[in-house]
UniProtKB/Swiss-Prot annotation:
Belongs to the bacterial ribosomal protein bL36 family. Keywords: Ribonucleoprotein, Ribosomal protein. GO terms for cellular component: ribonucleoprotein complex; ribosome. This is Large ribosomal subunit protein bL36. InterPro entries: Ribosomal_bL36, Ribosomal_bL36_sp, Ribosomal_L36_bact. GO terms for molecular function: structural constituent of ribosome.
Length: 41
C-alpha cells in the first residue's frame, strides 16, 4: 500500500479505483488490481 499526501493523482491511475473513508482516513481501493491500494497520510 502506498501512503501519499494527495490521492488525486493516484485515483486516476486505474478506472476501478474507489475513494473510501474509513476511521477518519482516506483510502483508494481497487478490487480488480490490489496493487493500486493507497492511503492518505
Amino acid at each position: 500500500m502506498k501512503i501519499k499526501n494527495s490521492l488525486k493523482s493516484l485515483k486516476t491511475r486505474h478506472r476501478e479505483n474507489r475513494l473510501v473513508r474509513r476511521k477518519g482516513r482516506v483510502y483508494i481501493i481497487n478490487k480488480l488490481n490490489p496493487r493500486f491500494k493507497a492511503r492518505q497520510g
